[in-house]
Amino acid sequence: MSVLQEIIDGVREDLEPRRRDLPEARLAELVAAAPAPRDAHAALHGGRTDPAGIRVISEVKRASPSKGALAEIPEPATLARAYERGGASAVSVLTEARRFGGSLADLDAVRAAVDLPVLRKDFTVTEYQIHEARAHGADLVLLIVAALDDAELAGFLQLTESLGMHALVEAHTPEEIERGVAAGARILGVNVRNLKTLDVDPARYAALADGLPEDVVRVAESGVESEAQIKAYAAAGADVVLVGEALVRHGAPEEALRAFRAASLTVR
């Protein structure tokens, strides 16, 4: 069984008690009462040419399957505000509990603390999770192409947009990129992590992203550990980089974020 499938199985198990405690009818009421979505597409678009530097989605991430514990992050809101001061264009919040140590409470705290679009980063395999994300104020949801068939991908994307949110559609291979584009992805993440081995190869980004439609927002995911990698992704045409580990492990994430954005300008 792949690591991805193990995580998805755990996500489905953890979802069941939430569905029992919060029936869909009540969830729909919470969606209707949620604050209006923030325009994530507008916030992320144009990073290839922005004179202020590449866009950054900064992540609240306590742990990962490949590295284990990364940072305690007792106050996600405090970290999110530092990201906002440092120039982040959006904040990603892990809500998967077993492997990443996240929660919907983290999402609530971050959404209330910043004025930036907020991504609920989880393993979306049901429509319920999309409604749940909106009920908790998410502006973006993650859709992993490898976890969904074509009908699910297109349907989840349509549902996400019908609720006023955008989707970060994540692909790892040329075939997944084709599927994401065919489904109508407007924000497409190219993740250079191998889902079977969890190894990261940042050099693959340029080849994978080459040929993406010009109007698609290009997000580089995984492998961002230094300013040199930011430069490489920017040179390869990324609009956005998603950075988690390098920021949560840094003693001064606000300063690190500013340095990352400035580094991208050297290749313009």
From Swiss-Prot:
Pfam families documented for this protein: IGPS (PF00218)
Record has Phosphoprotein as a keyword: no
EC number: 4.1.1.48
UniProt-listed GO biological process terms: L-tryptophan biosynthetic process
Keyword Cell wall biogenesis/degradation: no
Domain of life the protein comes from: Bacteria
Entry GO MF terms: indole-3-glycerol-phosphate synthase activity; phosphoribosylanthranilate isomerase activity
InterPro entries associated with the record: Aldolase_TIM (IPR013785), Indole-3-glycerol_P_synth (IPR045186), Indole-3-glycerol_P_synth_dom (IPR013798), Indole-3-GlycerolPSynthase_CS (IPR001468), RibuloseP-bd_barrel (IPR011060)
Alphabetical keyword list: Amino-acid biosynthesis, Aromatic amino acid biosynthesis, Decarboxylase, Lyase, Tryptophan biosynthesis
UniProt catalytic activity: 1-(2-carboxyphenylamino)-1-deoxy-D-ribulose 5-phosphate + H(+) = (1S,2R)-1-C-(indol-3-yl)glycerol 3-phosphate + CO2 + H2O
Pathway the protein takes part in: Amino-acid biosynthesis; L-tryptophan biosynthesis; L-tryptophan from chorismate: step 4/5
Family membership noted in the UniProt record: Belongs to the TrpC family.
Protein name: Indole-3-glycerol phosphate synthase
Source organism phylogeny: Bacteria, Bacillati, Actinomycetota, Actinomycetes, Micrococcales
